[in-house]
């Protein structure tokens, strides 16, 4: 089992922790959302600074000071998601570098999200400076329009580990059930090959199941919706906790039936539940056809 300590929290690939984002656009919104998020009792909080109305370090630091007063000792991820990876704002590489390093030096965030794969030209030095400042790094990579191949998923996660990321995160957008499987199998393979813990997810409704099967894929963190969602497909923290809290041993003597229209993801969810619980997966349509053995028309 992989483990990494973040603040007072132990992350492990056998027990995914739940992170809730704060996406306020100004000081008052950030504080208001923070108070509501704290009431949800998340394991981790993420502040999406790209939603914030300023990128000046003095204003960001003042915001972090006030935010820390509200969230107390809950571990904090500082994230400025760039527009190139689905974020709210453009920022130059130099400004992105300086912002992340300066935030790390404040000591107000335990984890700094670094888009390590797409910014590999500056990532190595940035990660080294963040580590020197005493913070840990989530190396991240996001694909909002596609799902890369399984091989690319593995290669991307391993590259971010080589760049020095303490945790390696990848989020992709599926267009079909096969895309979700690529993410699941790619995550499992990467987790077996890597030393660093991983965080992976397939976004949108189609990929929602990947947010709750971290015990299978190896993800140490899953993201749930706060006051507002920060990515497609996020469930509420209550929904995520209810599913993650299922004891697989308690349901092995029961059956689960998936009912829905064609193309709604029944097969994908059934397969994922099968991975998690060890229960056999039966395609009822195929089963009925086999049992009926309808003869060809004469």
Task: Annotate each PLM feature.
Residues 17, 75-77, 136, 197-199, ...:
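Proline-centered loop/turn at the N-terminus of a beta-strand
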Residues 2-3, 14-132, 142-146:
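Active-site beta->alpha loop and helix N-cap motifs at the rims of alpha/beta catalytic domains
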Residues 258:
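Hydrophobic anchor at the beta1->P-loop junction of P-loop NTPases
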Residues 111, 116-250:
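Catalytic alpha/beta core domains of metabolic enzymes, predominantly
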Residues 267:
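Walker A/P-loop
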Residues 264:
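ATP-binding Walker
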Residues 271-298:
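Conserved substrate/cofactor phosphate-moiety recognition/catalytic segment
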Residues 261:
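P-loop (Walker A) phosphate-binding loop of NTP-binding proteins
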């Amino acid at each position: 089992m992989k483990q990494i300590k973040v603040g007072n929290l132990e992350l492990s690939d056998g027990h995914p922790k739940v992170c809730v984002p704060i996406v306020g656009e100004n000081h008052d919104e950030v504080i208001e959302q923070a108070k509501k998020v704290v009431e949800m009792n998340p394991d981790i909080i993420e502040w999406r600074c790209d939603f914030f109305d300023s990128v000046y370090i003095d204003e960001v630091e003042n915001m972090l000071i006030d935010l820390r007063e509200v969230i107390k000792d809950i571990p904090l991820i500082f994230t400025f998601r760039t527009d190139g990876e689905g974020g709210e704002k453009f920022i130059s590489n130099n400004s992105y570098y300086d912002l992340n390093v300066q935030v790390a030096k404040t000591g107000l965030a335990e984890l700094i999200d670094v888009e390590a794969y797409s910014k590999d030209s500056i990532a190595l030095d940035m990660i080294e400076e963040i580590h020197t400042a005493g913070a840990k790094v989530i190396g991240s990579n996001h694909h909002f329009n596609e799902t890369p191949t399984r091989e690319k998923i593995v290669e991307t996660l391993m590259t971010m580990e080589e760049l020095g990321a303490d945790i390696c995160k990848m989020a992709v957008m599926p267009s079909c059930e096969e895309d979700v499987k690529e993410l699941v199998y790619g995550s499992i393979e990467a987790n077996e090959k890597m030393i660093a813990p991983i965080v992976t997810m397939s976004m949108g409704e189609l990929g929602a199941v990947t947010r709750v099967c971290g015990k299978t894929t190896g993800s140490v963190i899953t993201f749930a919706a706060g006051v507002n969602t920060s990515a497609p497909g996020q469930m509420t923290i209550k929904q995520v906790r209810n599913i993650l809290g299922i004891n697989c041993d308690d349901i092995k003597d029961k059956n689960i039936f998936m009912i829905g229209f064609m193309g709604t993801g029944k097969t994908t969810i059934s397969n994922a539940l099968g991975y998690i619980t060890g229960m056999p997966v039966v395609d009822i349509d195929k089963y009925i056809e086999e049992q009926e053995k309808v003869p060809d028309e004469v």
